[in-house]
Regions:
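Non-catalytic alpha/beta scaffold blocks inside enzyme catalytic domains
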Residues: 1-7, 15-177
Length: 177
């Protein structure tokens, strides 16, 4: 249309809907894909990750957020641990999100701010600021950027440590450091 495809220094740069969606999807946060956009239904792909991670991976994809909310309204999805995202504000159908959150038995919000989703929380956990985190983010150009913390988390735990504590309390054996 504008002649900006196929030439050096130009191209398509689709913007994603939320911060670091690119990086989290690259790492396998989609319910139907493992890291590197490898589909969970492919036996050979699952085997690679099962061997690497030492766990069995279900070949059925998990639910996406809208499907989780549908299932909550229907009564089959009972709880949500929402970390670092205000789904009530980021989803285009706020009434759908509110109905789903209200129908759940347990909503845990782990965030830096008491956001709109936190209004539905049974438990709110304080999150860490960017100053308290080590990690990476991927920008819209797919450049990976390193982040280094400048201070320890004031709440005592890094966000990933809270996730690990929850997982271990539910029977996992996560020993990340």
């Amino acid at each position: 249309l504008t002649g900006n495809i196929g030439r050096p220094g130009v191209g398509v740069n689709p913007l994603r809907g939320q911060n670091n969606v690119q990086g989290s999807c690259d790492m396998g946060s989609f319910p139907h894909e493992l890291p590197g956009y490898r589909h969970v239904k492919i036996d050979a792909v699952r085997t690679v990750f099962e061997d690497m991670w030492g766990v069995k991976i279900d070949n059925e994809p998990g639910l996406r957020i809208p499907n989780m909310l549908d299932a909550a309204v229907e009564g089959s999805f009972k709880g949500l641990y929402c970390q670092g995202e205000d789904i009530l504000q980021s989803d285009p159908d706020t009434k759908h999100v509110a109905a789903g959150l209200a129908a759940m038995d347990c909503v845990i919000v782990h965030d830096l701010f008491l956001n709109e989703t936190a209004n539905y929380a049974h438990v709110f956990l304080p999150g860490s600021t960017f100053l308290e985190k080590d990690g990476t983010f991927t920008n819209a150009e797919r450049r990976i950027n390193r982040v280094r913390k400048v201070m320890a988390p004031r709440n005592g735990y890094a966000d990933w440590e809270v996730t690990q504590l929850f997982a271990n309390a539910m029977g996992a054996n996560w020993t990340y450091t």
